Every structure is written in C-alpha cells, then in structure tokens.
Amino acid sequence: MPAPTLFDYSDHSPYSNPGNHTGYFSELSTDPEELHRFACSVVVHYRAGGPDLTETQKVDPDRRWLTSILDAAEMRAPLDGPRTHAQQVAGCCRDHTLLALGVLRTHGVPARSRIGFATYFTPGWNADHVVGERWDGDRWVRFDPELDQQDFDFDVHDMPTGPGSPFVTAADAWLAIRAGTADPAAFGVSSELPDLHGKDFVRYYVLYEVAHRHRDELLLWDLWGPELGTSYVRAAAGGAVATWVAEAGLPGADMSDAEFDAVADELAYLLVAADAGDTEAADQLAELYREDVRLHPGERVLTLSPTGHAAITDLATR
C-alpha cells in the first residue's frame, strides 16, 4: 500500500475539512504569520485558559472535527472579526495545527501534522506537542502555528529539523530513549503527572505520529490498539474501561508490553527513514499501519479526555 502522496496531503481529511466554512477558508491567507494569528484567535489552549474558561469552553477540548471547532467559534463571534477570551474555543496545539492544515489544504497546499515534543516551552523539559508541515515545492517546511515569532530565537515558520532541533518527533524521542541517549522522564505533559510522561507515554505518541502522518488527525486523548492495554488506561473510569473495550470489540488491548515496544521500534525506524526520503520505508509504514488492525483507529476509539469525559467514541457517526 503506497504512502500518502502530495496530492493526498493537499486534500482534506475528515478531520481537517472546514465543511460549510470552506468559502471563508478560501479567502484566508496562507501566509505563516496570518495562519498563526487566525489559529490563535479562534482557539485558546485549554490549560493556558485554566480557571478563566467558561462552562461552555470546558467541553471544547473534545471537538475533534474542524467543522465542530468552527461552528462553535462562529456561534460565539463572527469568524472574520475580533473575539474575546470567552468567545474562543478551548483546545490545544493539535487544534491550532488543524486550523492551519484546514486553510492550507483548502488552498491546495500539501500539509500534515507532526506529533512529538517541544523543547522550547520549559528548559529541560520535552513537552508533548503538535506542529505542522507544509510542502513548499521542494521540501517539507515545519512550522508551529501556536508561536509568536518575537518570543523565540528560531524561525517558528521554518523550524530547524534534525539532531538538536527545537521539536523532537515522537519517533526520534522513542529511538533516543531506546538507545539510552535520552531520559524518558523528561518527556510528556508534566513531570507531576506520572501517567502522562515517561517511556510508555512516548511509545504511544509514536502511534499518534503514524496516525497523523496518514491523515488520521485524532485527539491526543483518543486511544486505540495496544494503548488500550496499558495499566493507566485499564485503571481509568473506575476500572470500567476493560469492559467497555471488550464490549466494543476494539483490537489490540491484549498486546504485551514487549510486543508493543518492538512494534514502536519498527514504526519509529520507518518514520525516521521516511522523513529522510526513503520511499520504500514510507510505503512499508503505510502498509503496516493500514493492514494491522491494532495500529490504526477503526470506527470506534476510547476517549479519555482531560475534561473528565471517558467513553467509547463512534468516529463513523461523529
């Protein structure tokens, strides 16, 4: 099975499709600074918003479809005008990036999201993060639509890549941890959240990176496959998750820890090789992702949201 092509990346996924807002998106600029301003006008980070979030905003982080984000934003204020904090949609880096992808793809620009860790928010900490990449005609240009250029000493619209770069892909992070050259305890959401940092956290982010590369831009709290068998997930929702997963027939929960490690190794090596231009590796990755039902999301996933919402989500019916 071939890897996604530039044509595929220039077309909308179900997640990035702006739906009835397509006409408005076709009028927006694809200039990187304009993308930043638009994304950060529509979406405020749910953690940065903190106690100031309204009751309506507190359910926003579970909006996985761009149409839902835009519908909510438009109900609160016109999309083409200024908006107050309370009129923004609460989301995260994934949503800022999805907005940018939506604009770029509407204009036929190949674009994709990348999952990994940012070194530029807290010294010594690799914060889980989502950024974008756009094709400029010759190469993939990495950018962070969440960042204001004046606050950073690197080009946020054409970010450095490779060893020592400010954004570490999940694949690179995993391979560094496996090689013993990176401290797994320094990767995740927060060092104060034991279930949301460390080796296992990076491991399932490799799975997210593969999914997003193949245009399945799910929420960072949508879980499937071997993620369903981890102790953190099994203990969620008062221990009810195992029953939910079994009743929903979701595959992969019985994958052993050792097998999950080996699968993550293979996926990470293929991701890194594909990034380096190895088309065979990219095709092999795509085939592995599509053919192994444990590695890609099916019609249903388990959602364990930071809002406290926990349920089996039917992606087919939205």
Residue spans for each PLM region:
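Low-complexity, intrinsically disordered regions enriched in charged/polar residues
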Residues: 29, 33, 60-63, 83, ...
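His-Asp-centered catalytic microenvironments across diverse enzyme cores
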Residues: 2-13, 36-56, 117-130, 134-280
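Functionally constrained cores in energy, signaling, and assembly domains
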Residues: 21-24, 32, 113, 131-136
